[in-house]
Amino acid sequence: MRSRALGFFLAAFLAIPAVILGCIGCGKPVPTDAVGTGVADDQTLKNLAAVELNGQGATFVKPILDVWKEKFIEKTDGKVKINYTGTGSGAGVTQMTKKLADFGCSDNPMTSKQMAELPAGAEVVHIPLVVGAVVPAYNLPGVSEPLKFTGPLLVEIFTGKIAKWNDAKIAALNPGIALPDLAIQPVFRADPSGTTFIFCDYLAKVDENFKKTVGVSNAPAWPKGVGIAQSKSDGVAGHISRTEGAIGYIELTFALESKDKMKYGSVKNKAGKDVIADLDSITAAADASLEQKQTQEPYSLHQLAYNLTDASGEKSYPIAGMSFAVLYKKQDGAKGKAVVAFLRWATSAEGQTLAKRRNYAPLPESLRAKIGARLDTIE
């Protein structure tokens, strides 16, 4: 009798979790894409209407956009096609504001001047997509070990004050490396560029005169007669690869994925450490910056816009930045639902895992939660 009673008790006890789990589905279903999680439910994606989205902008983020758009076609059973053209951050924002693109991508947030030019009553939303790094990439034959740079040294190189690779200031930072007696050719972006903005933002923080003369902009006033300008990240990377003595600033992915495995150097950070750009050092910069209140325009003008340059912490890479999707808060019908679903998926764990494979640092989980909530505000 006792054994039968005990058996009944155990059976009833073990059934309790199943009853509880079954009741979770009672009444209103619990969504797999909960508010603020930044996770896109597969069935929701398959139920999207057939549309074609057009995006333009930052070349910084183009390598992962190319991956995301192909994967998203699969996720939506071929219903949502995404076209993305790397025209540069400036052009991407302009085309989006003119409604010639469904979304723009930019490595720098919209400025107060750009915001003032929006149609009356219009609002825009900035959605962080990935965290990346701008690296000083160079072509220096016979030098295999990564060179060490500081912010002030990069200022002197890119303003033409240091003209030879065997200059005493470069040699002092790189003892034991046989530097060639070769002219330095700085390579800049010819088009309005978020990569340029990130690079200049960092240089302006370490050199007040650079801020006053060259400025912090996606199209700064580089000194005349110094270096050469090339369009887009591909153009800069290509010129560096072809030109001995060249040095330019490009997103890390372009250096790592170049055919000739382009060399790039470390940069001394705020803590005085020589740091090479990699996923860990980029993540460290993001984590440190997310803790800081954003008081500098244009970052202070927008929710979820964070400045990552010259971040604190011994492990932080100092020339890190975010790339943002920029879109109108008020969206139209099926296209609006599709672009929000795409951004929600791109910033999900799945989308960020794909980004990591292309050498971008995943967005911090705390930020992804805020992104989900921000996407919920798009009408």
Language model features with spans:
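Residue-level signal for mature regions of secreted extracellular proteins and peptides
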Residues: I16-V19
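C-terminal motif of bacterial Sec signal peptides marking the signal peptidase cleavage site
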Residues: L21-G25
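Flexible loop/hinge segments at secondary-structure junctions
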Residues: C26-E379
